[in-house]
């Protein structure tokens, strides 16, 4: 959604920000992922990396398995997809009406400093910033909307796993505009995003005089490259599949497009859908 939010996601955000507070596991979310991988292997799961799925094979509106980029076919009577609902329907061999692709995408700048934010009295773990009378939660007409941002301070959680000081700055961005740039311009505009992130940090925290050691910037194009999400859509389609079902029998969806929010939400979605449609055999599927 633009300039709006699904009510269930609003509830999650409200509780997280105002009632519970944000948290971060020691060593980051990788700790949780590693525990899940270990459990998956313990119960006999096989993890195949670097094996892209070319198509989801469907016959008579029933899923039969997948075909990999290598041409190998894997037969299965149930498939749970985490690549997004529009992306899932796009590679299904029997085409159906594709859900609307989400418009919301972002840039994120990760800044590494020789001092930690706490050294300058910065105690926050996250700041939602807006420098306009209204908050424009929508895809901008330019590469980025610098009127608002989210600033994160990973060092300020109970467990600080870093030697350097780290600040992450996120701006709302336009996928189409980034996607049209030639390579030299693309690199130059990433530098502009970094400069805007540094300028905002200096504006909000003038006492933070640390030296920048390293930085990295990802854009909507980066999101599409590493996730395959159309339009670099971080929160997926506005047409969520709450029960995980698609229009194809025994083809299920998990992750953001099933309706949960964030990294932890996506993992909980996978667990819920695997339990419901796999272990519990949620028939009427």
Where on the chain are the PLM-derived regions?
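A conserved FAD-binding loop/helix module that cradles the flavin
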Residues: 245, 256-281
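Active-site-proximal substrate-binding core of FAD-dependent oxidoreductases
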Residues: 58, 279-285
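A glycine-rich dinucleotide-binding beta-alpha-beta segment and adjacent secondary-structure elements
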Residues: 1-2, 12, 150, 203-260
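Mid-domain catalytic core of redox enzymes
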Residues: 54-162
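Active-site/ligand-binding neighborhood in enzyme catalytic cores
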Residues: 1-43, 50, 226-238
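Hydrophobic, well-ordered secondary-structure elements that form the walls
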Residues: 80, 169, 201, 255, ...
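Beta-rich nucleic-acid/ligand-interaction surfaces
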Residues: 46-47, 51-64, 68, 217-227
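C-terminal segments that line or cap access tunnels to active or ligand-binding sites in enzymes
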Residues: 115-218
């Amino acid at each position: 959604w633009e300039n709006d939010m699904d009510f269930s996601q609003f509830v999650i955000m409200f509780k997280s920000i105002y009632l519970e507070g944000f948290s971060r596991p020691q060593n980051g979310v990788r700790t949780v992922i590693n525990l899940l991988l270990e459990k998956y292997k313990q119960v006999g799961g096989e993890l195949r990396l670097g094996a892209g799925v070319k198509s989801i094979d469907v016959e008579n509106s029933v899923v039969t398995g997948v075909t990999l980029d290598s041409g190998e076919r894997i037969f299965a009577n149930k498939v749970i997809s985490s690549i997004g609902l529009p992306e899932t329907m796009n590679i299904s061999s029997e085409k159906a009406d594709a859900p609307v692709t989400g418009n919301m995408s972002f840039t994120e700048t990760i800044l590494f400093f020789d001092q930690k934010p706490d050294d300058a009295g910065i105690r926050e773990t996250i700041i939602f910033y807006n420098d306009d009378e209204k908050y424009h939660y929508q895809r901008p007409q330019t590469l980025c909307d610098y009127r608002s941002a989210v600033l994160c301070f990973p060092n300020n959680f109970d467990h600080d796993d870093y030697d350097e000081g780290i600040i992450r700055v996120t701006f709302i961005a336009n996928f189409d505009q980034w996607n049209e740039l030639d390579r030299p311009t693309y690199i130059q505009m990433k530098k502009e995003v970094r400069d805007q992130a540094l300028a905002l940090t200096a504006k909000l925290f003038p006492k933070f005089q640390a030296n920048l050691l390293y930085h990295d910037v990802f854009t909507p194009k980066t999101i599409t490259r590493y996730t395959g999400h159309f339009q670099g859509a971080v929160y997926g389609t506005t047409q969520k599949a709450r029960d995980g079902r698609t229009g194809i029998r025994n083809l299920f969806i998990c992750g953001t497009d099933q309706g949960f929010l964030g990294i932890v939400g996506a993992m909980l979605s996978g667990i819920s859908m695997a339990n419901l449609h796999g272990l519990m055999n949620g028939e009427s599927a």
